[in-house]
From Swiss-Prot:
It comes from Danio rerio. Plays a role in the DNA damage response (DDR) pathway by regulating postreplication repair of UV-damaged DNA and genomic stability maintenance. Promotes the recruitment of the SMC5-SMC6 complex to DNA lesions. GO terms for biological process: DNA repair. InterPro entries: CANIN_dom, FAM178. Its main location: nucleus. Residues 112-130, 149-166 have a biased composition (Basic and acidic residues). Disulfide bonds: none annotated. It is found in: Nucleus. This is SMC5-SMC6 complex localization factor protein 2. Disruption phenotype: Slf2 depletion in zebrafish embryos using CRISPR/Cas9-mediated genome editing or morpholino gene knockdown results in a significant reduction in head size and aberrant craniofacial patterning in the pharyngeal skeleton. GO terms for cellular component: nucleus. It comes from the Eukaryota. Residues 72-87 have a biased composition (Basic residues). Coiled coil: none annotated.
Amino acid sequence: MNSTVVVKRLQPNNGNINPRNNCSLSSMDKKNLLQKSSSYNRNRDISYALCKELNENLRVRGGLFQSESAVKARRHTLPHSSHRRSPERRNSLLFQQRPRNSSGQFTHNPNQKKDRMDNRDHKTSIKKELNNLNTMTSPEGRLSLSAKRKSEASTGSERETKRPRVDIQATSSSSILNSPPKFIRRAFLKSCNESVITIKETNSPIKPSISDNKPKLSSSLPRQLFCADSNAHSSQTTKSPTNAEPKDAMVARANKNPKAPPSQPHLRKVSPKSSMTFDSIETHFTPDNCASVAKMSKKTNGETEIIALSTNTSSSSHYKESVTGRSSPHQHDLSSTSFTEQASSCKMELDERAPMKAEQSRSPEAIPAVTVKVEGSGEHKCFPQWKDPLDIELGDDWDDELREHCVISLSSSSSSHEDEQLPSLKEILDWTVRVPVTPEKDAYSEPNTPVLKAVPEAVKTKATSYRNTLEQMLQEKEQYQRSKELERQLLESCEEDLMNLDEDENSESKGEDISLEHREILQRFSVTSCAIRDIHPGEEIFTPAKFGQLFNHQTLDLRKISVTPHNRSQQILLQARSEHVLSLISAGLLRKAYFSFPCQPEVTRWLFQMTSVHPNPIISSRIMQSLHTIALSAAQHIVEHKSQSFTVWVPSIRDITQVFLNMGASFISLFPLDVLQPPFTEGDLLEDFKPEENSQDSAISEIKDDATLPVHNLESVLSYLSLCTALCPKAYTDEELLLLLAVVCRIGLETHFQLLPTGSFSLLLQNVLKNITDWDVQISKACQILTDLSEDHHNLRRIVSILPESSRGKLLKRHLSVSIISKLLNHTCTYNPSGTDFKLSELKPFLPQMRPSSLLKSLSSARGSEDCDATLDQQAYYLCYSLLTLTNEASNFEFLPSAQRNDLRCLSSLLEKHIKCDIRESEKMLYRSKVKDFVARIYTKWQVLLTRTRPQEGMLYDYWKPPPEDELPSSPQGQTCIKAQDPQESPEEAPTPEWSSSESEEDDQSKDEEEEDWLKDPDNLQPLENQVKMEQSAEDCVEDVSDAEEESDVPKQQLEGFDISGALEDISEEELFEDDEDLLNEEEKQLLKDEEDRKHRPVEEASQQIEDLLAKHKDTLEMKDGMLLDAFI
């Protein structure tokens, strides 16, 4: 069998040739067909009717029947729909064929139906051949339709004139492979290049009319021209003779099907002079388009079938196929209904393409080409494949992404899907608008790696994967709980370690875990800085567990008091319950009730007890305000109105002691001294109260929970006592005031009140000291009592600090400080205040005893070997610091009396001499530095006080004088004797005139002035016994002086010829010292003689003689001094 295959050559303009899109035939072809076909006239009407019905069913853009001139005019324009009432078809991406039997969508022509009924026999034969073809091609009876083939059928006359071609003549007619048009975009589905289209069509005697109303194809198709796999078979085109049986078929495929060999003659049969155009099908969807299924149903009589199109994706395929065929006038057009039915039964299997894809990717010499095989001969013609540069620029992923999201699956069985309802236009548009889901990891293959992927059945929403899942949250929760448990265990272990720190240290020292060398290093570099405490240790006065043992806010009932109310407000208060009374008091009813009427002492005592025991500080303060109001109102009535009915209730020592005992204090701790005891005992106080066990237990349990004493109760008691002592100065006697003073100072040492401000204590003590009548006598008792309140030196400092800053308070501080100093140094109080005035001289005997070394010796002797040396040293400096603090309090003067100026100067020198100089600082003993710093501050304070003090009486200025023990005894007579040397015994040292002239005049004047001052001093000269005796002995003195001058002339003459420089050079230092010793011995002898002579000489003569000798031997003495200086130099 001869056949003709026409293959398009590569064009110089990248193949962008305007293809012909019409299915019409030229005039010469028409004549040949009319001559050769005898059934042309009979089948013409039937063909026209079928084509018209096909156009209505498919609703493709542009009609199938258009004139040839219209096709040429609209060749490069986009196709538009012939049905104006459905513009949505312009955006449709699928070919859809509506069922003919749907009356709601289409209108059928009865004439056309009649024509089709006449041609029933012809359609039946076509159906049979299609069934035979399905059984021969594949077991499933269907082949795959490639959606990536881009080809177009065109007529030959106009095409051949514009484009060169290669003809292989087998018969009188030929098949032409033409390029698809380039102006159709995304009109069809785009599939891989290895897809196969297999069509079997029977030759019909009915000749369809030539139509030019064919839709134009995409403009991107020329870019994909001749894209076929090198290993795939090209389209096989065969033609039968003119008088052959009425069957036509065209087979175009790119891959080899082992189940349907390419040599089967029945796959492609074309009548003579017939031409057929195979439309290009393109899968060119964007990612936002969803796969759609087009189903086209036909007649129920079996004349038509459904076309099934399937697409497959390939990540490495850019090659396209284009196969164009021509059919005879007796053959149906490919766009007709019969052709669609035949094409629907052909579908290619997916696994047939995988071997070829892998082979193509592995072939390094694979060149894109189109292979055309002529059936009946073993020749294969390969033509080079053209690839558009734009596709190269876009890359592989562009086509792959589009193909991944585009799937069309149509059924191949017409009988099983004829009655199914097709999707509506709205559903199709919704598919296009729907946003695609992010593809999964395996949706795309690796670049340039052709891997067979199964066609996804449908687009499904990917399951959202959250980062924090329930299991992770549970794991995090468990981990958090474990960390919390670990933290709790660590905290507990830290607390246990802190509690057992001392035990561990002792065990380590016993076990000798640390070596001796390491222990020495630790001792060497250890630092002790907390030896001197800033807060006093205190003493336990109150026991929190005993708080409220006598009464509490629940047992105190105002209704038990038998008093007569004076007004309605008092009656309401006295008859109300305890909890209601407190509310009424807070509302101010108590002050209103007793503002104009006197308050009964029982009510005031009840209020005093309630404010000392109520746990609520707000209620306690309001009760205290009511007490203040009642007391001030009573005092006002007493002073202004002289009313005898009003009285200020002042709590007695007994009431005060009861309150303190109820707060948890013991009787012995309040009154520890035997010399100072109240007139009542603890048993007397307990007889007045019979506490209820329940209330007592509840109150004690509340205090145990708090574990601290309520400070507001103590402040309320002290505040009311201060008010009472201020309003009634004579309410207490001196003995009671001393008891109150001792109790308040004792309470001030409570450990729970260490950080409590001293304002409340100081205010009460100020009123107590002020109310003492016999102050001069009671001050010594007060000093003795307060000194014995504690044995700790820091607690005694605390007692001194809480005393007020009033005049009596300062005086008591000074005397008490000295008393405590004497007690600490002498172990007994040896100081007894003699009067109200304090003298600084009382501190002089104690300062030398405050030396740290002396304190260390006393402590070591008292305690023996109980403590180590380091501990004793710390205690010694701690005691020294306390003693210095008391000394500072004793010398705390704002203006020092001038009479005590010398005493303060003496104390300053003693402080610096005995204490400051005795402290040896060390980097390991910072407490020593603290003591030394405190000494320096005290010394500076005293010096400032000295500058602010007036000088002594009768003096304008007060100069510094050394202390008496530092003054050296000086005898003016000895100084004059040293100066008055005997010139006869030291002739060598007599000065020459040259040496005398070298001295400056200023030195002479200064010496003369000193001598004159010494002579003018009356203490140095003895009184003249008799002026007459002095005149008689004057002559004898002159004679003696003249003799002395004659003796002094001899050494002067000898010294004139003496070379001093040479003599000094020859004389050594040892000889000079020996000469000096000889001179001193001679001077001593001369002095002894002079003293014997002075006994018989009058004073005036002696003075005159001394003056003459000094004037005469002045030069000699100066020369002697100069020689000694030169010798030493």
